[in-house]
Amino acid sequence: NGLEITVVEQRGLPLVAFGLMLRAGAATDPRALPGLASFTAQMLTEGTATRSSQEIAAAFEFLGARLSADAGREFTLLATETMAKHWPTALELVADLVKHPTFPEHELERVRREQLTDLRRGKDDPTVVAEHVTPGLVFSPDTGYGHPIVGTEAALGALTRDDVTDHFRRAYGPGSATL
């Protein structure tokens, strides 16, 4: 199916860490919706065809596993760490997130509120301000590099569930992924 798999073995601890990296980073954001890749990554953990966001969190917690879903400039990474005996189940959970996301509207609104709050809080932190301003000073806004990865208040306020599902359909798939 085109999924590239890379394995690095390190013996010593009964842990498995794996990441599903997809070429779906902020560079793929449409010019009018900076932050769409980041928002889509956050929404992956908010519901699938068979699990609610609470059930997803509970399943990872039951395994003692950690999960993060974040977009960078080039890639989106779903990173997981769990006990070695639980890695097949954790991998099945991650597969469910990227194969059957539902992007529930009520979760979308909650995530939007949280991200807008984070953006507003960041205005008081010089480091965060620099991270948001620098891309636009270095790169043209016509590229996928001239905006902050997390987007802008205007874009976050404007994006819709259709935007998220369209981005997911365009940017996610085994051909754009490395495990």
Predicted features, each with a name:
Residues G2, R11-F60, E92, T134:
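Active/ligand-binding-proximal structured segments within catalytic/core domains
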Residues L3-T6, E55-L179:
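Charge-rich, well-structured scaffold segments of protease-associated domains
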